[in-house]
């Protein structure tokens, strides 16, 4: 009796996969000689997009990508920031070509994002000229992903069907310009808590840090409002938070456009001729609930005042947010997050640099003693 069902499954699934593969194959054929670009009609359509069309339902990049990173690195390359001139786009000029598989509405979304870069920064997305070897190809390749900064030859920015949303396009293009995610900053532990126990094991490497010696934040403070900041549930294996801001009234990961700090960093990276002074708040004014799995209800975070910092300070002495005294206590059984008002011990440091790899097993009886000795900070033992 099961045979007919088996036959149905075998005949239906390959057809679906075959369609997806054909689209991908078509894109790969187009990449090599594409010169198609946005036109005046696309930009006119972009100006007519409604707020709902621009800022409607947002699907996190990691969900679209099935919990894979949206940053793709060349083989053998380590994760590092962009501070060397060779990784920047010369003269802030990004030659590009786009896939013919985008609909008029999708082309309008791309045009809107490009227009924002042109209006707020000196970055210029320019149509690729025939025979130009180094350029950005924007197409429906496989999910949402980009390399960081400029690479040689044809560079792919994949914006597939699930990625065609304004905020996602702005986010991915900022990777193209040269920036990693905000939560990967070397100083992130001063501003967010990583809840390792709640992170999907296959995504632990998404919470590494960018090497300070190989990146620059151009004197800008940690930015909770950055378009490049993931949300509190990013890569969660159990629906509970994977990272939380130390400023308890702040929210992360719900940006729908550039923050002021995003724009400031881009303009400083590319030495844009005009840059306005920016004051960046370190906390959101909104009152945001945190889900508590133990009580199955929402518990509100208490409000605290906003703090602002002058963005004119130089890169040698970057402005820093006041580091709150609260520390996090995480239940090993449920993933529940609570705040502890006591200051963490100044001696609370990991003794090795790879604690993240086994952070989801901190309280496993087999390695508990080793983890408590080598990784007390990551495991929240102190």
Swiss-Prot record:
Active site (record annotation): 172
Domain Peptidase M12A: 80-273
Extent of the signal sequence: 1-18
Cofactor names: Zn(2+)
Biological process terms in GO annotation: nematode pharyngeal pumping; nematode pharynx development; proteolysis
UniProt GO MF annotations: metalloendopeptidase activity; zinc ion binding
Subcellular compartments: Secreted
GO CC annotations on file: extracellular region
Tissue occurrence: Expressed in the head of adult hermaphrodites but not within pharynx cells. Expressed in pharyngeal muscles, mc cells, intestine, hypodermal seam cells, arcade cells, spermatheca, vulva and rectal epithelial cells.
Alphabetized UniProt keyword annotations: Cleavage on pair of basic residues, Disulfide bond, Hydrolase, Metal-binding, Metalloprotease, Protease, Secreted, Signal, Zinc, Zymogen
Phenotype on disruption: No visible phenotype. In a nas-6 (hd108) mutant background, enhances slow growth of nas-6 single mutant.
ShKT domain segment(s): 348-382
Residues where Zn(2+) binds: 171, 175, 181
Propeptide: 19-79
Keyword Transmembrane helix: no
UniProt EC number: 3.4.24.-
Protein name as annotated: Zinc metalloproteinase nas-7
